[in-house]
């Protein structure tokens, strides 16, 4: 059995239907705001429901400086990259080659429909 190592959550980042960052998301949740509405990201007429919680008006280019990362990134990958960047900033971590083996990411997501 391997020994358990302690970890610390040092930064949080979010891209959600109620906010494009953690503070906005949290404030909107506390205020009881919902991100649900009519689906606009794709034609949902063939589905039994036309209601979803989509991330709207999100532009990863305003957060991610390295355009090469975004060139081939899907929409959901852009969410993850932006949330990761926010988490790093929140933690005050600037990854360098000498420290990259000492930190990691845990990324969670709900359902995202990919478009080709």
Residue map of PLM features:
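Conserved "HGTGT" condensation-loop signature of ketosynthase/thiolase-family condensing enzymes
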Residues: 1-113
